[in-house]
Amino acid sequence: MRALARFALCAAPLAVALLRAAPAAAIERNFAGSAQLDYLFVPDATSGPAGRDVYDGFTTEVALKLAADLSDHLSANVKVCYGCHGFELPMAYFDFRVADELVFRVGRFSPSFGAFNIRQDPANHATSDNPLPYDMGRMLRLTQWNLGVLPSPFPDNGVEVGGTHWFGERAQLDWAAYAISGFRAPTGATDLLWILSQTRSGNLIDNNGRPGGGGRVAATFRFGDGNDVTVGGSVMYGTWDPANRFYYLIGGGDLSARIGRTQLRLEYLVRRQTFPVDPAVPFKLPAPASGQDQFEKHGAYIEAERAMTETVTLLLRADGLYRAGNNPLASPLATRAAVFRYTAGGTLALAPGLRLKASGELWAFTNDVPYHQELELAFHLSLVGTF
């Protein structure tokens, strides 16, 4: 109830402003939403090597969005979602468009990074969960890995400047640069604490007063009707501790192609992060004399999606995570550890705006990369609706 109350206090004033900002004839509004009920069955959820380190069973994800065009140059968006994290306010911002090539975004939003973030809503992709580089809590052994490289969505407070430029009718360039509060963790932590960036944490104030920043550039080339290729690159940097001593640097590249009824997608992410070494905590590798160590977390996925008919879509995906670097002796992960996942799934349209999703996953965990040491199975069945 407290989370719901906080959301109401945050979102209600902006929603009222959107609804009453101008006479009905002068403002265009759009209200949309989606809901997904997913059941995740993991046969070894309680008896496997990691124990019950997964959000299996039923989970619900709901998203409601209100968008309004206040004028030819000003628009506003508010979005609330509900899921395993409780209530969240991932979107509450204004866009001021000077031209197609220059748009200012101010408020709370997910900064431009990667290609998946654009379609991270469950209604916009064929599987029940995110690719592993962007995992937000549906992966197996989630606490061991502390989610993905960059859990999506990743809303933050700040400002973004971006735009789109067309080169004729066949080529398009998108760009964005932003300054945000940045990810954070308390003093002495060895990894980011993602909950501190979420509304449910109850405190969205920057812990060190120094903004993080980054940007993205993407180019799209069109080859006839229904055929295009997009290539993009993204970067993000910030300090995460109260004293601004330790940093994270995230980079990514993406490639996607649409060829008739088939879509191909490939993304690669890496996060390099420094952290303090506590002399009282034993680590697996000798600690540097400086008291500062680092690790890298890599993630990638490749998937092919094809619309077989007007109602049936099939998907194949391979994705994984790889961590390299020092960690506490108590961690079950070695200094070189990886997880691989192989997914086959599909969707069935039951009615306009209503789809059934099903997928099977083979997981492989290893502390001896690239060998697959421990195998687990998982199965998703979900129903998703949009309006």
Task: Give the positions of each predicted feature.
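Outer membrane beta-barrel
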Residues: I27-F41, D53-A185, G209-G214, A218-D225, ...
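Outer-membrane beta-barrel pore domains
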Residues: P49-G51, A92-F96, N117, A126, ...
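Loop-centered beta-sheet repeat module
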Residues: A185-D241
